[in-house]
From Swiss-Prot:
It comes from the Bacteria. This is Crossover junction endodeoxyribonuclease RuvC. One of its GO terms (cellular component) is cytoplasm. The active site is at D8, E67, D139. One of its GO terms (biological process) is DNA recombination. Binds 2 Mg(2+) ion per subunit. The gene is ruvC. The lineage of its organism: Bacteria, Pseudomonadati, Pseudomonadota, Gammaproteobacteria, Enterobacterales. Coiled coil: none annotated. Pfam families: RuvC (PF02075). It catalyses: Endonucleolytic cleavage at a junction such as a reciprocal single-stranded crossover between two homologous DNA duplexes (Holliday junction). It comes from Sodalis glossinidius (strain morsitans). The RuvA-RuvB-RuvC complex processes Holliday junction (HJ) DNA during genetic recombination and DNA repair. Endonuclease that resolves HJ intermediates. Cleaves cruciform DNA by making single-stranded nicks across the HJ at symmetrical positions within the homologous arms, yielding a 5'-phosphate and a 3'-hydroxyl group; requires a central core of homology in the junction. The consensus cleavage sequence is 5'-(A/T)TT(C/G)-3'. Cleavage occurs on the 3'-side of the TT dinucleotide at the point of strand exchange. GO terms for molecular function: crossover junction DNA endonuclease activity; DNA binding; magnesium ion binding.
Length: 173
């Protein structure tokens, strides 16, 4: 049994989702959003740090799966996203949790079957895969999709043995 915390980082809204994996079975444990309503970026990062710390304390995950930074058209937005992402990674690393990173296209491909899927499609598939009564909010759905992707990738790596996949701390290599 493994508990995975998925994080969809953002400087204003950071989504989180927690799933438990037992073999091929996934169980929804919780999800939500850390909302930072202050304008000051350092204060927002502090709120993200506190929020992720609280989630880890509450759910005791075995690892953290997080979305990789993508190339944004707005450099300022990309920098803020990277900082929010870095805060979540630091929290996990300070608590000795392994961190795994996944590209947004890989997450969409794994959960929906298309790397170009729309947010609504991700929400629908997360709802279906986890047997939820309603679609989760978009950022929480993305975080759950990241956790589901990690479950899928780690399960495939176990099936393949050491056949080229190395699930070490950090990126899937």
């Amino acid at each position: 049994m493994t508990v995975i915390l998925g994080i969809d980082p953002g400087s204003r809204i950071t989504g989180y989702g927690i799933v438990r994996q037992e073999g091929c079975k996934l169980t929804y444990l919780g999800s939500g959003c850390i909302r930072t309503k202050v304008d000051d970026l350092p204060a927002r990062l502090k709120l993200i740090y506190a929020g992720v710390s609280e989630i880890i304390t509450q759910f005791q995950p075995d690892c953290l799966a997080i979305e990789q930074v993508f190339m944004a058209k707005n450099a300022d937005s990309a920098l803020k996203l990277g900082q929010a992402r870095g805060v979540a990674i630091v929290v996990a690393m300070n608590l000795d949790l392994p961190v795994f990173e996944y590209a947004a296209r890989q997450v969409k491909q794994t959960v929906v079957g298309s790397g170009a899927a729309e947010k609504s499609q991700v929400q629908h598939m997360v709802r279906t895969l986890l047997k939820l009564p309603a679609n989760p909010q978009a950022d929480a759905a993305d975080a759950l999709a990241i956790a589901i992707t990690h479950c899928h990738v780690s399960q495939n790596a176990l099936r393949m043995g050491s056949g080229g996949l190395n699930l070490a701390r950090g990126r899937l290599r």
